[in-house]
Regions:
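Flexible, acidic/Gly-rich N-terminal and inter-domain linker regions that tether
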Residues: 1-65, 359, 367, 375-413
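Conserved, mostly hydrophobic/aromatic
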Residues: 57, 70, 109, 166, ...
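Short, charged beta->alpha transition segments
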Residues: 58-60, 89-100
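Conserved AdoMet/S-adenosylmethionine-binding subsite of the radical SAM
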Residues: 92, 96, 115-287
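Residue-level signature of tetratricopeptide-repeat
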Residues: 342-343
Length: 413
């Protein structure tokens, strides 16, 4: 029976929700009858551009038919699920109509593999050509490249898209062989290498590229994951690595049970560590190593690093370099800028930092101001960590309805 456009949209938007390269919510509160609003992470989602703008995207698969049988994927060949596929004209028409109604500002397009990699990529390319050349659509387009597709097809897709990606999914070749035998790391990364080389040859602004790693489906530790991310960044292959806490959708002896909860906190810590790699000049083996191969879920990665390296602390806030300031837990790039600017005129103390609107809730355990260290806890790893995890409870004071000092003087309420 032929499916309507509405049915196809329902199926293919829902099938795309597990790709976190574009997602607007980590919540699973679904729509309830009689209530307003929902937090679905499928359909229209949000992402951020390089200049910080938040854009709404239609997040959808071209098709959820697939010749692959990856154990972790809801769209695997052996799963008995509802299947659908757009044709290029249908997808282009939906996108342009959503855009004209101001529902979206762009398109996030992924796909299962139908027939073979080249055939699927050609269908996607045809949809992009209709959008860009026929409809003159100049909005944002993010396309998932199909590993194994021909280089010439990829070149055309890259010329029409704003961002491309190819998901590695699993951090090691061993796990890929076990759970996704049709894929290898080299095969997945090859389209991104093509895209990078094409951008460099044309001497234009390099196209943004990203990948996704699933966290918690296989036994790899955080060191394995961050090492891979670091290598990909160092090779200038990627602008961003996304981490996706594994959501069990299939029963498989090689995967966690379906009732297993996604490791969301671990995913969050990996994103924080990834930020340190990209913007704070940390190396992966500074954050995690053979002795501590996994991040501490109780504290953020910068605090975790600081607690393992107390020999560098406490740092004197008035004399240390910009690079050293960036390594102090709780002080970010904007805080460092404020400190460097302010200390040109005076030596700073703890009160000065508060006046600069710099939170010292964590930083105070790792710094001195004018040679003075905070007196709340002793300078030991265990006591500092405990103080950070379990801060002292503040005494709750009932706020007064009136300004008591003013009332006492004037007699007014």
């Amino acid at each position: 029976m032929k499916k309507s456009i509405y049915e196809k949209m329902q199926i293919l938007a829902d099938s795309a929700k597990y790709d976190v390269s574009c997602s607007s919510s980590g919540s699973d509160n679904n729509y309830k009858t009689g209530e307003l609003g929902a937090t679905h992470n499928s359909g229209i989602c949000h992402t951020f551009t390089a200049d910080g703008r938040c854009v709404s995207l239609l997040k959808v698969l071209f098709t959820n038919h697939c010749i692959y049988d990856c154990a972790y994927c809801i769209n695997r060949k052996s799963n008995e699920i509802k299947r659908a596929a757009f044709n290029p004209r249908e997808l282009a028409d939906i996108t342009i109509n959503f855009y004209k109604r101001n529902y979206i500002e762009g398109l996030f397009l992924s796909s299962g593999i139908v027939r073979d990699e080249d055939h699927t990529m050609r269908l996607i390319l045809k949809a992009l050509k209709i959008l860009r050349q026929e409809y003159r659509f100049n909005g944002y387009i993010h396309v998932k490249l199909i590993p194994g597709a021909d280089e010439k097809i990829i070149e055309e897709v890259v010329s029409l898209a704003n961002r491309v990606s190819s998901n590695i999914e699993l951090p090691s070749d061993k796990s890929l062989k076990l759970l996704a035998p049709n894929k290898t790391k080299e095969k997945v990364l090859q389209p991104l290498k093509y895209a990078r080389d094409i951008s460099l040859e044309k001497e234009t602004k390099p196209i943004g590229m990203s990948t996704q790693l699933i966290v918690g489906a296989t036994p790899e530790n955080d060191k394995d994951i961050l090492k891979l991310s670091s290598v990909l960044y160092d090779k200038a292959l990627l602008k961003r690595v996304y981490y996706s806490a594994y959501i069990p959708v299939n029963d498989d002896k090689n995967l966690p049970a379906v009732i297993t909860k996604p490791p969301l906190l671990r995913e969050h810590r990996l994103y924080q560590a990834d930020w340190l790699l990209r913007f704070y000049d940390f190396t992966y083996d500074e954050i995690v190593n053979d002795e501590n191969p996994n991040l501490d879920e109780e504290v953020d990665p910068k605090t975790f690093w600081a607690l393992q390296n107390l020999q560098y602390f406490p740092m004197e806030i008035n004399t240390v370099s910009k690079e050293e300031l960036l390594r102090i837990p709780g002080i970010g790039a904007r805080g460092v800028y404020k400190i460097i600017k302010a200390r040109r005129f005076k030596s700073l103390d703890f009160e000065d930092l508060k006046k600069l609107k710099i939170s010292i809730k964590r930083a105070k355990y790792f710094i001195t101001c004018k040679g003075k260290y905070q007196k709340e806890v002793s300078f030991y790893k265990e006591t500092i960590k405990e103080a950070i995890i379990k801060p002292p409870k503040k005494k709750i004071i009932q706020p007064s309805l009136f300004d008591m000092d003013y009332s006492a003087i004037t007699g007014e309420l």
